[in-house]
Amino acid sequence: MSRSTKLTIGLIAAAALVLAGFLLIPDRGQDTPAAPEASDTAGPQLVREDSPRLSEGSSEVVFVEYLDFECEACLSLYPTVEELRAEYGDRVTFVVRYLPLHGNSLEAAQAAEAAKDQGEFEAMYKALFDNATEWGHQETSQRELFFSYAEEIGLDMERFEEVYDDPATAKRIEQSAADAQALGVTGTPTFFVDGKRLEPTRVEDLTDPLDAALEG
């Protein structure tokens, strides 16, 4: 299957989920996330110094995804983003921002942040998406499962738990959500290339802006 075909399938699947109502509706019945308290008075930023990076490209081009690890549309487009990373990852910096909308997505983001503390954000990012059907849309906390992923990755579990439970970790995620709200991001996934918001309905809506930015 070609790269273009894979990307198209991912976009079609995500679009179908939007139509089915999976994109914005959290498990708790809210249509939008509760307004978070911003921890930084300097104003909203699309990318912060502590924002997780999946890759550090050789150019100044930055691809940002606002995601919710429990979001069905994010899961559908996860392979698409992986294809983009395979194609552009050596040249483009891929940044993740959090917008938790579902019942366990905050704790999933905490797990990702705790793994990032040990230099293993990408490994946890993949574990959360690869095992999403195992933990997603559950009514109870999936903390034990997230910790099992950390063990499988080989993290220092004492340090992982310390960062996972640290109020500063939740505050960083809260800041990401506050930035999202200030930037007009209300659903996931939402993509940006060099600060410009994308509205992808076809493969070229993602690849063309990347190509143009790299050529600029």
Describe these PLM feature segments:
Residues 87-150:
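Structural microenvironment flanking redox-active thiols in thiol-disulfide oxidoreductases
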Residues 70, 85-88, 116-119, 128, ...:
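Sec/Tat-exported extracytoplasmic proteins
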Residues 1-28, 151-216:
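C-terminal cap of thioredoxin/glutaredoxin-like
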Residues 69-72, 99-104, 130-135, 168-169, ...:
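Solvent-exposed loop/turn segments at secondary-structure junctions
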Residues 1-101, 174-177, 212-216:
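Extracytoplasmic thiol/disulfide redox context detector
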Residues 77-80, 107-111, 120-124, 142-146, ...:
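Stable alpha-helical elements in mature extracytoplasmic
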